[in-house]
């Protein structure tokens, strides 16, 4: 059910399982990336998701406030208690995607709560490459929003053959936040919303 992280028992269960075998390689690596003297803190990946067994990698911009440890859940999760996660959970449910199908991530995985700059996107490229190495079953990359797309294009400059070599299907759409629909043109708003639904349907079709 959407926003399950608002439930303390659900959140506690996710915390207790954060080093379950399917997510341990990712979350142990996340532990290594946390550095108060470097780029700072980043959230774990919730064990609700597929971890290294996931077939789809979802990339957003950067971790939002609902991921913060102590304030939010401490996890990247489509069950976080915020509108963006709620929309993603709904879109997944509409097309038959399960949480285990997905590995959630960000173009810049450290918490900044603002648009990443060029240096940060470059750092994010290295993180995405390492994540793909950890998750060999990923077949689809879902880029949600302009920053996710920009980060992927920077990745392709370094590794132009990765899509072909890994057999990746790359799907682009708008960010699942409310702000992504901000426009005075009602037709454009509806087109953006429709594209988000289409993109999730494309992910589901690619995984069949």
Model regions and ranges:
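A polyanion-binding, active-site-adjacent surface
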Residues: 2-159, 168-174, 178-181
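Short, surface-exposed amphipathic charged segments that create phosphate/polyanion-binding patches used
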Residues: 119-122, 182-194
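A polyampholytic, Gly/Pro-enriched intrinsically disordered region
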Residues: 187-208
């Amino acid at each position: 059910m959407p926003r399950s992280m608002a439930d303390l028992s659900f959140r506690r269960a996710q915390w207790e399982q954060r080093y379950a075998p399917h997510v341990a390689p990712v979350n142990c690596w996340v532990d290594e990336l946390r550095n108060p003297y470097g780029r700072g803190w980043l959230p774990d990946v919730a064990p609700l998701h597929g971890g290294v067994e996931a077939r789809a990698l979802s990339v957003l911009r950067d971790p939002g406030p609902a991921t913060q440890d102590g304030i939010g859940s401490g996890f990247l999760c489509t069950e976080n208690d915020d509108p963006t996660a709620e929309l993603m959970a709904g879109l997944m449910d509409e097309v038959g995607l399960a949480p285990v199908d997905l590995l959630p991530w960000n173009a810049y995985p450290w918490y900044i709560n603002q648009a990443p700059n060029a240096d940060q996107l470059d750092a994010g490229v290295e993180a995405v490459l390492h994540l793909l190495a950890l998750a060999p079953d990923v077949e689809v990359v879902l880029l949600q929003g302009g920053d996710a797309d920009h980060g992927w294009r920077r990745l392709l400059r370094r590794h132009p053959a990765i899509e072909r070599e890994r057999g990746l299907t790359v799907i682009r759409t708008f960010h699942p936040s409310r702000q992504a629909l901000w426009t005075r043109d009602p037709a454009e708003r509806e087109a953006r919303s429709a594209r988000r639904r289409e993109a999730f349907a494309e992910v589901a079709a690619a995984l069949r």
